[in-house]
Structure formats: C-alpha cells, structure tokens
C-alpha cells in the first residue's frame, strides 16, 4: 500500500482546510493512506471537545483514504481518557490508526 507522509516540519494542521491541502498532496502521489506526523497536529486537534480532529479525519476518510497519525501519543492519552478511548477504538479498525513511528506503520501494513 502506498502512503504519503508529509514533512515533520511545517504549518500546524487544524481542521478541514488542512485536510484539503493534505488530500491534494496525497492525490498527486497516488497514495492510499495518509500518514500524518503527530508533531504537525495543532494542539487543539488532540482536545476532542474542539471536534477538530474528527473533522480532519472525516474529510480524509470520506475521500477513501486511510489515515495514520505517526508519533508517540502516550503523553497525550495519559492526560485525556476520551482521547485514550478514541485512540484505542481507532486502532481496532482499519481506517484510522495511531502508530508510534513509521516502522510500526509499515509493520501494520504488512
């Protein structure tokens, strides 16, 4: 499976507008999965009450992309039980994953 991994450095990603830019980049590369560096997510994305993460992920998955958030999510889920539950449920599925690093992503892709 081909995936697009944006650079770790760059503007913070937040909401649907950022998702559209990522979609354009993924389409040009014929990717099937978008791997987003955790470091690129705006702080509000990990606060589920803002709904920004949901809007971002929904935009990508609506267009048929699988999504992986790549980075150490542990410090964030230690502070939020709702985020911990979201990550757990996401990782049980096939459309959105949270993985520690790119090697773990490649392992999940088999």
Regions found by a protein language model. Name each.
Residues 2-110:
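Amphipathic, Lys/Arg-enriched alpha-helical "gate/interface" segment within cytosolic domains
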